[in-house]
Amino acid sequence: MKQSIIIFFIIFIFTNIIQCKFPDNKTRSDIDEIYKAKYLEFDTNEELNSQYLKHSKNYAFPNTIRINNRGVLFISVPRHLFSEEIDKYIPGTINILSNNKLKPWPNQEENDFDKGHIHSIVGFEIDLDGNLYLLNHKKNKERELLVYYPNGEIKDVYNLNQVTLHKDHESLLTNIVLDLTYNFAYITDTGKIFEEDFNNNKIKNDTKSSLLVLNLKNKLTIRFLRKEKSSMPDLSLPQRNKNLSIKDIGLYGIALSCDKRFIYYSPVKSDKLYKINTLFLQDERTLRNKDINILNKKSSSFEMMSSARGLFYYTSIEENSVLVNFYERILTFSNVRSVRHGNYFEDNVPVSLAFNGTTGYLFYLVNKHNIFINDNIEKELDVNQDNFFIYKIKVNDRSYLYPCNIYSYIPNSTWIAIIIISLLMSYGVFKLIVCVTKLSPKKKEMEPNEEELAYINDEEN
């Protein structure tokens, strides 16, 4: 009886431990603030810096962050391409964070608005070798993907003009994910966010949002999903947080599973997440047979990212949080975990995510992105208050670019506990068998009768 109780208790503990797949919601004490600023400060020469402070500091804001294999944090600062007098004084559209200042990368000359190659960067990616993939918006309305070596030399240029829209900067390339196993890049084109509706005297959303597919080997490009429901904002979605309202924006976030089999994408204003097999995207002839699955997510979001552990991270606009879920295991997103929670940033929202693959930290950028979007980039920042933040939190995870390791979400301590409990269970089962054996009635050896004894004696004689 005692052994049975012990075994039952061990099984109960074992069952509860293996259910602990992800830590509870993180508190603010778990989060390290690594950057805070009222306005962006650039590490440039004195003359250029003074011109920037005079003309552009109220308009420059960070959009995307990434971390290379050496732990260097890169930040994009888009030039809005609506006022050359403002844009040309923003020193760098792609920068590294150094001593709480932004240093144009690879140098100031390459970022020069008139003479440099890099005009305006919204989204970009860094591969495991440290190469940078920059979605460049040229001031002449052309679009291209610039690939740079870690030392700042240009490695390759991909012309995207065949699949982008050039009239009045109608293509806004916001995010890119890389499949370097099969040499493909997937890019979200939000389309021109605003379009004047002169009949009603207001600004309305454009419907040119699309997904671009680029073959990195032969440089062929495909544009698809234009005017499809999965690429358009959900106008019926209720706004749950009035302080963090957002315009009706199309495709923005995109994620690639670590096994490179699935693309996940979503318009900004949508609680739907769309999933499509990458095999359908790699050949224009198979696009008509594409099978798009619809999942759910908890909030409108700017950026999403999958990880090497098979987890799905995304920014939540209404909840002002970074959420994480087992995207392949719980397709309804019913058990979302919050990596950061609490509405203590007023009208700031999390907009970008980045992993440090060496340390296992998740970095996320918080800014007033919604102010620029909601006011058609006509409102200046209030530089008397903090506007930009970058935080990091330990998640023991890495980017989707690393090989999949989907079972590593179970902590080492849990694995040790599982092994110990398994040994205890084995020992308990062994003790139970021994106990049952001892309690079993033994057969008594029957003594020979007189006739048998006489027969035995005769045989012996």
Protein language model annotation of sequence segments:
Residues D30-G92:
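Beta-strand-rich domains and repeat architectures in extracellular enzymes and scaffolds
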Residues I34-H55, N100-G116, K155-D168, L220-S245, ...:
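Surface-exposed loop and turn segments in beta-propeller and other repeat-based domains
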Residues H55-N69, D112-N131, V163-T188, K192-I193, ...:
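Beta-rich, blade/repeat-based domains predominating
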Residues F74-S76, L134-L135, Y186-T188, Y265, ...:
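Residue position within the beta-strands of beta-propeller blades
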Residues R79-L81, K138, T190-G191, K269, ...:
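Residue-level signature of beta-propeller blades and closely related beta-rich strand-turn architectures
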Residues Y89-N100, R143-G152, K204-K219, K379-R398:
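Beta-propeller blade signature
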Residues K442-N461:
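Cytosolic C-terminal tails of single-pass type I membrane
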